[in-house]
Amino acid sequence: MTETTPKTAPWTVQKRTAVLVLADGTVIEGKGLGATGAVEAEVVFNTALTGYEEILTDPSYAGQIVTFTFPHIGNVGANAEDIEDLTPANRHGAVGAIFKADITAPSNFRAAEDLDSWLKHRGIIALAGIDTRALTALIRERGAQNAVIAHDPNGNFDLDALKARAANWCGLENLDLAKDVTIGQSLVWKELPWTLQDGYGEQDAPQYHVVALDFGVKRNILRLLTGLGAKVTVLPATATAEDVLAHNPDGVFLSNGPGDPAATGEYAVPTIGKLVETGIPLFGICLGHQMLALALGGRTEKMHQGHHGANHPVKDYTTGKVEIVSMNHGFAVDSDSLPENVEETHVSLFDGTNCGLRVVGKPVFSVQHHPEASPGPQDSHYLFRRFINLIRERKGQAPLPEREQAA
């Protein structure tokens, strides 16, 4: 046990009803919330102050337990509109959550239910009342941890069995989780970005056609594409290049998603490689970025602790500007492995890891971070306009301003 080993928070006096058991045998006790049961997953931490519902329903968090570093939780409740999972009935996203404080009563006009009830409905096991700073420090020092999170209202746990489950879990390396979170069949997405006056509108006159390969896509990504005039046809992760081209797209989008890019890439990389050669504009985010790098001849690697939060500084070499972005990934592209015809366009100012690339002479680019920013900043919304401008250029149309003009 090191100095950073988390212990039950000193102000917690309730009987333990949940435990987090790490692969090294460390046991952390607290109050159980949400669903009951036990599940193996990787423990990470997220530094965002807001947007817990969007975080927990992001399919990229499949196979993970999210530790929230901000102490307050539940303030705005939960609702059906803020879910990021494309198919909410399947409940793709994080399997567990860890909080410092107990859930507070919601105080927001959009709240439909409290967070505890929502966690139960989503099947997410939660643990509260622990020293999340100490757990975060442990992850920072030792790396993302394989673990089991368990919740029993009676507080009955077979710790030896839970320790064995945590120690024997395979982890995220070599796991293809995209096949678990992707849609079962194609669909056309028409929903527009949310506004205070109208909520979510519906697109009626698209100007372009984008095919999105769904490796775990977030709804807000699709909304931003429709908001720029694109009809979006979403295809399953296993779609072939021939499947994509049969829709006669003006552009192709490679979505975010969970798991190891090398594992999903077993079937996705050949498809991406063929699409790159067509000359059709192509844009990738997160897992899509990583698999594009693999298709171009690069390599990916597992990160020590990953990047998870809405306050990450990234430098855009194409403009010289620094952006504050939202990130959620545990694997990264090895920039030294990229071939000469591929330029690094973005880099993390936290650790220097690759955050973007483009192919010289082709309308192909991608980023590691999440420019749709839900939750998070909007510094990177221009990337969607950059993608649409590649489509417009191919059609002989004038480009849009990359950043919206102030009213």
From Swiss-Prot:
It is an enzyme of class 6 (ligase). GO terms for biological process: 'de novo' pyrimidine nucleobase biosynthetic process; 'de novo' UMP biosynthetic process; glutamine metabolic process; L-arginine biosynthetic process. It catalyses: hydrogencarbonate + L-glutamine + 2 ATP + H2O = carbamoyl phosphate + L-glutamate + 2 ADP + phosphate + 2 H(+). The active site is at C286 (nucleophile), H370, E372. Pathway: Amino-acid biosynthesis; L-arginine biosynthesis; carbamoyl phosphate from bicarbonate: step 1/1; Pyrimidine metabolism; UMP biosynthesis via de novo pathway; (S)-dihydroorotate from bicarbonate: step 1/3. Keywords: Amino-acid biosynthesis, Arginine biosynthesis, ATP-binding, Glutamine amidotransferase, Ligase, Nucleotide-binding, Pyrimidine biosynthesis. Its EC number is 6.3.5.5. Residues 209-397 form the Glutamine amidotransferase type-1 domain. GO terms for molecular function: ATP binding; carbamoyl-phosphate synthase (glutamine-hydrolyzing) activity; glutaminase activity. Pfam families: CPSase_sm_chain, GATase. L-glutamine binds at S60, G257, G259, L287, Q290, N328, G330, F331. InterPro entries: Anth_synth/Amidotransfase, CarbamoylP_synth_ssu, CarbamoylP_synth_ssu_N, CarbP_synth_ssu_N_sf, Class_I_gatase-like, CPSase_GATase1, GATASE. Residues 1-205 are annotated as: CPSase. Small subunit of the glutamine-dependent carbamoyl phosphate synthetase (CPSase). CPSase catalyzes the formation of carbamoyl phosphate from the ammonia moiety of glutamine, carbonate, and phosphate donated by ATP, constituting the first step of 2 biosynthetic pathways, one leading to arginine and/or urea and the other to pyrimidine nucleotides. The small subunit (glutamine amidotransferase) binds and cleaves glutamine to supply the large subunit with the substrate ammonia. Composed of two chains; the small (or glutamine) chain promotes the hydrolysis of glutamine to ammonia, which is used by the large (or ammonia) chain to synthesize carbamoyl phosphate. Tetramer of heterodimers (alpha,beta)4. Belongs to the CarA family. This is Carbamoyl phosphate synthase small chain. It comes from Brucella canis (strain ATCC 23365 / NCTC 10854 / RM-666).
